[in-house]
Amino acid sequence: MKNYALVLAAGKGTRMKSDIPKVAFPILRKPMIEYIVENIEKSSVEEIYLVLGYKREVVEGIVKDRAKYVYQEEQLGTGHAAMMAAPVLSKLDGNTFIMPGDVPLIWYKSIDRMFAVHEDNGNDFTIVTAHYEDPEGYGRIVRNEQGVIQRIVEEKDANDFEKEIKEVNTGIYIVNNKKFFSLLKNLNNNNAKGEYYITDMVELMKKDYKIGSYMIKNNSLAMGVNDLYAISKAEKYLREYINKDHMLNGVSMINPETITIGHNVIIEPGVTINPNTTITGDTVIKAGAIVGPNTEIHNSRIDSHVVVRHSLVYDSIVREGTTVGPFAHLRDHADIGTHNRIGNFVEVKKSSTGHNTKASHLAYIGDSVVGESVNFGCGSVTVNYDGKLKHKTEIGDNVFIGCNTNLIAPIKIGDNVFIAAGSTVTKDIPDNGFAIARSRQVTKEDYSKYLISPKPKKEE
């Protein structure tokens, strides 16, 4: 028998107080629905169906062709959402895993365990439950003396005895397709909200079909994310889980509670990460690197024995033995060579540098190809923008660029060139050249009195 998944993801998420669909909200910079789809893909599920409604094109843009879609134009409850998929799933032999789209921490191994319990016990309808010492806000699982589930009662409808029940409904189910979906049409909406609820299927199925349960051991995996506070709780859980995994694999973290590592980040053993550091995207950090404190790295590669402190690195490569920062900014496919020094308040954009090149402070390198052993003096700028277009700067090997130098692109600087401080260079410089492009200094002795008013003397 095949396994299917049905994710109920049509809601707006009004408690998020945003126009973004709830399931598209980022958790550690990745949309909520991504976590769900990725884990379902890793499980034994063969086909995923998403029920979409509010701003469905946003969710489709995230998931693309990894799922099939059905649409719920009006959001009339979980049962109504499942009805939208019934014409398809009722015809398919097998079982379906049904879950809300706002439970991003569900794990693929848990999904497979749910299927196993469902099949091993011959269940037609398996309700995934959890045990909470404080179950406030959750629907309670009501069982008879034999332990068989009789109904699920929402807290607002529960009596005093039922409110004391600590086993709750997670909103996650495994169902036999033909039996469950054929009965959905019998659901009614005789309730205060006029909505259809999957929980009412217990009443429809308990007489003729087998209802069972699976109690999830880690309640966090079934945590619903309905507001921004819940997003912070989900991020905290994921942060602790991810950081622990890296530390057990040999990554040193100082104050790990202040460090955020994305799901796709690869960090080799022997890396040290200092406080207040965020590493996301498809980033790779190699052994011996030291990152942070106060550093952001996204979609980048940090090679062995690189040090990045108090800096931003986006979509870039930093090669072996280089130091970056403090307060440097690498972006837009910067490729920093081996044993470079990119110092404080230096920005490198869409540029590459060769071995042993240094820009120690207050420099901008943009749209440039820079050779080996180049020294950028303080205040050096590659002037790449003419007001309409960006232009390229090419700098050879063994070039000395004096302080406060402007290189007006497009321009080529040859090998073994020396550029005097304070120059504005507008023409190419050949190999072994010396360039000075500034006005000659004129000094007039005893002349400042004509320009500066004398300060009055203080009275003794």
Curated annotation (Swiss-Prot):
Its EC number is 2.7.7.23, 2.3.1.157. Mg(2+) binds at D102, N226. The keyword Cell wall biogenesis/degradation applies. Binds 1 Mg(2+) ion per subunit. It catalyses: alpha-D-glucosamine 1-phosphate + acetyl-CoA = N-acetyl-alpha-D-glucosamine 1-phosphate + CoA + H(+); N-acetyl-alpha-D-glucosamine 1-phosphate + UTP + H(+) = UDP-N-acetyl-alpha-D-glucosamine + diphosphate. Residues 250-460 are annotated as: N-acetyltransferase. It comes from the Bacteria. InterPro entries: Bifunctional_GlmU, GlmU-like, GlmU_C_LbH, Hexapep, Hexapep_transf_CS, NTP_transferase_dom, Nucleotide-diphossugar_trans, Trimer_LpxA-like_sf. Transmembrane segments: none annotated. Residues 1-228 are annotated as: Pyrophosphorylase. The active site is at H361 (proton acceptor). Its cofactor is Mg(2+). GO terms for molecular function: glucosamine-1-phosphate N-acetyltransferase activity; magnesium ion binding; UDP-N-acetylglucosamine diphosphorylase activity. Pfam families: Hexapep (PF00132), NTP_transferase (PF00483). SUPFAM superfamilies: Nucleotide-diphospho-sugar transferases (SSF53448), Trimeric LpxA-like enzymes (SSF51161). Acetyl-CoA binds at N384, Y385, A421, R438. Keywords: Acyltransferase, Cell shape, Cell wall biogenesis/degradation, Cytoplasm, Magnesium, Metal-binding, Multifunctional enzyme, Nucleotidyltransferase, Peptidoglycan synthesis, Repeat, Transferase. In the N-terminal section; belongs to the N-acetylglucosamine-1-phosphate uridyltransferase family. In the C-terminal section; belongs to the transferase hexapeptide repeat family. Homotrimer. Catalyzes the last two sequential reactions in the de novo biosynthetic pathway for UDP-N-acetylglucosamine (UDP-GlcNAc). The C-terminal domain catalyzes the transfer of acetyl group from acetyl coenzyme A to glucosamine-1-phosphate (GlcN-1-P) to produce N-acetylglucosamine-1-phosphate (GlcNAc-1-P), which is converted into UDP-GlcNAc by the transfer of uridine 5-monophosphate (from uridine 5-triphosphate), a reaction catalyzed by the N-terminal domain. HAMAP family: GlmU. This is Bifunctional protein GlmU. It comes from Acholeplasma laidlawii (strain PG-8A).
